[in-house]
């Protein structure tokens, strides 16, 4: 296994980093700030260990149907189209933000799920291997099964997805504490 480092994310850490994140992404969209904050703080901790390159899992949800909203597309038989659309628009939706937030700390992200050959292969996998049905709460089935078959613990391989900004508590800190008293638009001037 890989060594795991755990850091508590506090209100003061989020507050102290907010201006840097908003300036890095150049927007005051709360969801983008929350996601950007997770990348920013993770890359900051990585940089503190003098590491310059990190691996990101970006692309897995778009390739293998990981987002909950894909269940509607599955029901309407439009999942393949939506996955392809999301892949085509991924740079402006996710990658640009993540790159800006990680590079603000001097850390370059590598994106193995966006390898050209893997993308071409994954986009041609039938949707039934990605989402098992319209009520599939886990999604990304082929990816989870592969991870488990390669030796990843079942509890980890089949753990329900939780967006980083929610799992870290950053979204809650931003909404309930930090942004109550701050006009983020000021950081964009």
Where are these regions (language model features)?
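A short alpha-helix-loop-beta-strand transition element characteristic
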Residues: 153-160
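Long, intrinsically disordered, low-complexity Ser/Thr/Pro-rich regulatory/activation regions
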Residues: 183-189
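ATP-dependent adenylate-handling active sites, centered on carboxylate activation for C-N bond formation
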Residues: 1-150, 165-179
């Amino acid at each position: 296994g890989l060594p795991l480092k755990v850091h508590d994310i506090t209100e003061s850490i989020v507050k102290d980093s907010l201006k840097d994140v908003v300036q890095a992404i150049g927007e005051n969209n709360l969801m983008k700030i929350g996601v950007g904050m997770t990348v920013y703080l993770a890359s900051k901790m990585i940089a503190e260990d003098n590491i310059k390159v990190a691996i990101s899992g970006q692309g897995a949800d778009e390739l293998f149907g990981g987002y909950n909203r894909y269940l509607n597309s599955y029901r309407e038989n439009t999942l393949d189209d939506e996955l392809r659309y999301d892949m085509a628009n991924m740079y402006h939706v996710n990658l640009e933000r993540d790159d800006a937030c990680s590079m603000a700390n001097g850390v370059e992200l590598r994106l193995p799920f966006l390898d050209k050959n893997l993308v071409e292969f994954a986009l041609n996998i039938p949707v039934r291997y990605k989402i098992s049905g319209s009520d599939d709460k886990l999604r990304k089935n082929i990816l989870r099964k592969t991870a488990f078959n390669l030796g990843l613990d079942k509890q980890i391989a089949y753990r329900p997805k939780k967006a980083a900004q929610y799992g870290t508590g950053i979204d809650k800190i931003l909404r309930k504490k930090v942004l109550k008293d701050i006009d983020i638009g000021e950081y964009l001037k």
